Amino acid sequence: MGDAPSPEEKLHLITRNLQEVLGEEKLKEILKERELKVYWGTATTGKPHVAYFVPMSKIADFLKAGCEVTILFADLHAYLDNMKAPWELLELRTSYYENVIKAMLESIGVPLEKLKFIKGTDYQLSKEYTLDVYRLSSVVTQHDAKKAGAEVVKQVEHPLLSGLLYPGLQALDEEYLKVDAQFGGVDQRKIFTFAEKYLPALGYSKRVHLMNPMVPGLTGSKMSSSEEESKIDLLDRKEDVKKKLKKAFCEPGNVENNGVLSFIKHVLFPLKSEFVILRDEKWGGNKTYTVYLELEKDFAAEVVHPGDLKNSVEVALNKLLDPIREKFNTPALKKLASAAYPDPSKQKPPAKGPAKNSEPEEVIPSRLDIRVGKILSVEKHPDADSLYVEKIDVGEAEPRTVVSGLVQFVPKEELQDRLVVVLCNLKPQKMRGVDSQGMLLCASVEGVSRQVEPLDPPAGSAPGERVFVQGYEKGQPDEELKPKKKVFEKLQADFKISEECIAQWKQTNFMTKLGFVSCKSLKGGNIS
């Protein structure tokens, strides 16, 4: 059996791959005297996704460093955060979290017997804790409470009082769990500094705070439980993992906001200390990297292709997910998963008839599912001389068939392999016997001779990337636009091409995360 790690080695294990440590000198002093007591808490809201492997890998580091580790399932916090977890589902979601987090830890070889698991409501409803909540509320300003939760608590126009209580409860958890340190994402920083300011006001000591970086989602932004395309669920099927990775932003040579590279850096490398790029012999064969920066350097130099990177991540990720899928393949856990996260489409529909005081539906651009597409093939419609039948990759498992009236305006060879902009949530429509599963959006100018140009997404775009109107990127598109409600038609009335050839809605630009959607030359044109 090897020697116990020295205080310096423990410090290295505890702090490696962290973005920031608050209270490092205090941490060093504790490690000279005894083992560190640390906790990680997770509010039991949306389904945990693969980015949760980041804290799991750090928990493995803490155990290697001899730390006493507590995992808190913060059920009360989940309810306080704008009721992200309804009260009637709170117990079910907490049970789901406990089972899935334990399955994750087992899949990376973490011994569960060395961990302490606790629910927030096991102690947060006690007389002593409740009294401290009141004591804290007497010294905390509304401004500080709101500021502390800004990165974590859901921000709404008229915030509930519960969201202002959230940071205070998280601060008190440090005292009631009797720990030296709290570990969390860097998005928790304002809550951590809030705790450092206010716990001493109650006579409690200031704790050490350890922060890991936030892993970008597959779309390049923060990986989020509420943004479906940005994350891979722990129970996603292999085909879903493949589909989501295929749509992930991973531009050749671009290492900025690259969710695929970031996942390798913060999850796969810490767990395995190496990463293997799988590729055909004709492209150089497999290559093993033991230093992440070497892989990043090769990707930046385009020695490693995005396709090979994604395929290699897919294989490595499925090895982590297989034990979790297997564990949840039992009747009891399948029932738990469906009960904790009921399918909204299967909920009981509201009673027929107009609801009293119902508000009209908002007609806003985020209701449109517009995506970057790549035309894989173009053929003349067999029964219509003016129509093309295109197969377009829009980031799904199979390409979509789209019929468009471009024969008179755009040569076939200009469309082949072209990146285009496709409206994907129109109701499929038969066009001269062929089902069209989308609309290829184009700019047009009427006149003596009508001119039409397909809209162009920014250079470097990938099929499946979302196209949105600036300022409306957060909303979820309708599953399918209902023809009778004419949502697209109402919005289209304000579509226009600017003098700079940028596609706009009410003078606000259409864009992707890489830049603006444009056309070649039709200034002032319409969009259809």
Curated annotation (Swiss-Prot):
It is an enzyme of class 6 (ligase). The keyword Nucleotide-binding applies. One of its GO terms (molecular function) is tRNA binding. Transmembrane segments: none annotated. It is found in: Cytoplasm; Nucleus. The modification Phosphoserine is found at S205, S386. Resveratrol strongly inhibits the tyrosine--tRNA ligase activity. Trans-resveratrol binds at Y39, Q170, D173. The modification N-acetylglycine is found at G2. A motif ('HIGH' region) lies at residues 44-52. It holds the Pfam family tRNA_bind. Belongs to the class-I aminoacyl-tRNA synthetase family. This is Tyrosine--tRNA ligase, cytoplasmic. The lineage of its organism: Eukaryota, Metazoa, Chordata, Craniata, Vertebrata.
